[in-house]
Amino acid sequence: MYKSRLQELCQQRRWAPPEYTHRCAGPAHAPLFGATVSVNGVEFRTPEDAARSAKEAHNIAAKAAFDHLSSLPLPPPPPPSENQSSYKSQLQIYAQKKGKLLPSYQTIREGPGHASRFKSVVTVDGKAFESPEYFHTVKEAESAAAKLALMSLPQEASSSEQVPVQPLSYKNLLQELAQKHGFSLPVYSTTSDGSVQVPMFKSTVVFQDGSFQGEPANTKKQAEMNAARVAFQHFEDRRKNALSSTVLRGPHLGQGTVHISAGQVKIAEPVFSVPLASTATSHSATGATDRDYHSLGSTNPLPIAKSTNCADVHIQPCEFKDEKPAFPEPKTVLEVMDSSPELTPLEDAYSAPVASTSTVSSSGCGSDPLASASTVNSTGCGSVPLASASTVSSTGCGCSLLTNRVQVYPRRPDLVLPEGATVLPFSDDVWVAVSLPTLNH
């Protein structure tokens, strides 16, 4: 049959299938038929009375078309299939380098089932590109759409120099963070979503009692990397916020003073937790000279009593400047517990160590002498007496505290309070005041 041979010829030449029409002439009991066939835009007709049936007329027209078309030279061969597939491969490589979703193709079909033509629309990086014309196969249509997309996208994308730098391995960074701080290792959970051709993965990592979900990705490895990046950046931001708050919040200077008629006791709190220094100013019989010393790291001068002659130093009786009535109250001891830093003199090179603990004890408020006085070494005028504890005895001076004994400590994370100690309400961010049971003297 020439109809089948003509059909094969059209497929070889990549033409559309032939289209047939027929005509009927003559009486109804003896009709005669003629046919017309259209192949690649050219029509071939038979005479009006060429056949007694339409099928025979179609075959005669197909023979005429086949004889004419088979004598024509063959068209140039189509481009190799590998060139067509290379456009799709290049477009897929571009999307992977850019970290985008893989290209998706949508096919548009036109014409009857036996003579269909196809167009393709490819979507990449949120942009759609349609093939410029219809093709006889889906493969050709997709290749044309991919070629158009590659030509329309930025040209630098195809250059080997534009290959992005390998991103940081956030999975390794998160694991190093866990090992450094003794945390449990991160646990990843990945789910797959989307079609088989274009799979999508979502990953969630559980780390330090927190769950972090990353952006979807085309591969499981990239999805886990995205989740690890979210978790790592969360802990990095929290660490930076903690550092900035620590720098901005500094200890505030505070000073508490108890005024005494013949002496003064100061509790100074220098900047950045420089240890306290308690000073007592004494007046000797022949006169005394006060010299100022600075504690290292502090701008507050600390007055130190220094005798300039060899006479014995007599400490005058003291009384509190307080308007409260003198009722007998429990004995009160105030201690500042800390180590004393090195002191540097302002005027000369006298060496004057300062006691690390200053104690003010109360046993009387009148003219009673001090219960325990500082030891004075009068062997020479150039030496300064050392005082391990200055004790002032006073009772019933109108000064009352919650308990019998108070100690002040610098606030530290590793601070351990003595047994039975109670934190007092006037403690702050720098110092901790605690009350202790009565001392047994």
Curated annotation (Swiss-Prot):
<keyword id="KW-0694">RNA-binding</keyword>
<protein>
    <recommendedName>
        <fullName>Double-stranded RNA-binding protein 1</fullName>
    </recommendedName>
</protein>
<feature type="domain" description="DRBM 2">
    <location>
        <begin position="86"/>
        <end position="155"/>
    </location>
</feature>
<feature type="domain" description="DRBM 1">
    <location>
        <begin position="1"/>
        <end position="71"/>
    </location>
</feature>
<dbReference type="InterPro" id="IPR044450">
    <property type="entry name" value="AtDRB-like_DSRM_1"/>
</dbReference>
<feature type="region of interest" description="Disordered">
    <location>
        <begin position="69"/>
        <end position="88"/>
    </location>
</feature>
<dbReference type="InterPro" id="IPR014720">
    <property type="entry name" value="dsRBD_dom"/>
</dbReference>
<keyword id="KW-0677">Repeat</keyword>
<comment type="function">
    <text>Binds double-stranded RNA.</text>
</comment>
<dbReference type="Pfam" id="PF00035">
    <property type="entry name" value="dsrm"/>
</dbReference>
<dbReference type="GO" id="GO:0003725">
    <property type="term" value="F:double-stranded RNA binding"/>
</dbReference>
<feature type="domain" description="DRBM 3">
    <location>
        <begin position="169"/>
        <end position="237"/>
    </location>
</feature>
